[in-house]
Amino acid sequence: MEFNDMTSDITGGVKEYDIATNGISLHVTEQGAGPAVLFCHGFPDTSYTWRRQMNAIASAGYRAIAPDMRGYGRSSAPADASLYTPLHTTGDLIGLLDALKISSAVLVGHDWGATHAWNAALMRPDRFKAVFGLSVPFVTRGESSVFERMRESGRQDDFYMFEQIRPDADQIWADAAVTIPGILYWASGSAPEGEQWSPLDRTRSLYRAAPGPLPSWAEADYVAHNIAEFRRTGFHGGLNYYRAAEPYFTLSAPWKGAKITQPSFFIWGKSDGLKELYPFTLQQMRAGLPGLMGGLELDNVGHWVQHEASAEVSEQLVRFLRTVDAVLS
């Protein structure tokens, strides 16, 4: 493994560096000192999505570490979709901890990043001592994949993941100046009821242009950053996670029925379109998360909880970290 510090100084306690591990290079942003907290972003995003939460936990005495996940930002982006399974992302995260000589960390994940976090905790409970998930809950591996279930129910023409793996998906997303504001708006709680993104209705897709300026929670510097990054990289790497999802289901057979026993917490938006797909009650979640310490549904919030309710998410995260410290000490 190689560690290459990309900054000669630290501005506002934030530093960036590259780590070569697991066959790729990860670009990492870090802030603070103390027990390690590892942040995993989703689609279409970069580590910059976490800047508010990173600042909050660094101020509370924790070490916030956020990579651009493989396929995104300034990290490597293999073209081969088979290299984007949870086996690969868990390997990336373990390699990151090893390079930084960190024995264990708490995971925080949003969207696909929540999937990465849940799976890493499932596969390596010795290295990941707790999980704080946003927007995508953990569901134990069952008998069939979501793709199979959608085909069997005749919803293959409606289900959004089939759109994400179309041969022309890269081109559909390519105009980042349109698609980045669009997904932020339509998947949020700010979009009008009945028009918000639905994963099962193609007329309410993620591809629609935003109707006007974004709400204030979508901070201009964050939106501009994402537009610039995806103009530079394209969307192929991020879309590869969707392409890898169905093939990985077969590989995940060893974890059929397996549960995550570490302490966990889950936050979701009441207006998140993913509620059409996943169980969003604490009772249902505890079937796979016996260590679930609680959860929170946020009113008037959609998929982008770390932005739409930034202060609340940061407060809940710091509270969870302190509770985990007390429980595991």
Curated annotation (Swiss-Prot):
Catalytic activity: an epoxide + H2O = an ethanediol; (R)-styrene oxide + H2O = (R)-styrene glycol; (S)-styrene oxide + H2O = (S)-styrene glycol; 3,4-epoxy-1-cyclohexene + H2O = cyclohex-3-ene-1,2-diol
Record Gene3D superfamilies: alpha/beta hydrolase
EC number of this enzyme: 3.3.2.10
EC category: hydrolase
Pfam families in the cross-refs: Abhydrolase_1
Keyword set includes Amino-acid biosynthesis: no
Active site location: D111 (nucleophile), Y242 (proton donor), H303 (proton acceptor)
Start and end residues of each AB hydrolase-1 domain: 35-308
Keywords of the record: Hydrolase
Presence of keyword Transit peptide: no
Molecular function per GO: hydrolase activity
Family per record: Belongs to the AB hydrolase superfamily. Epoxide hydrolase family.
Oligomer and partners: Homodimer.
PANTHER family reported for this sequence: EPOXIDE HYDROLASE
Role description: Catalyzes the hydrolysis of various epoxides into diols. In vitro, shows the strongest activity toward aromatic and cyclic aliphatic epoxide compounds, since it shows strong activity toward (R)-styrene oxide, (S)-styrene oxide, and 3,4-epoxy-1-cyclohexene, but very weak activity toward (R)-epichlorohydrin, (S)-epichlorohydrin, and 1,2-epoxy-9-decene.
Name under which the protein is recorded: Epoxide hydrolase
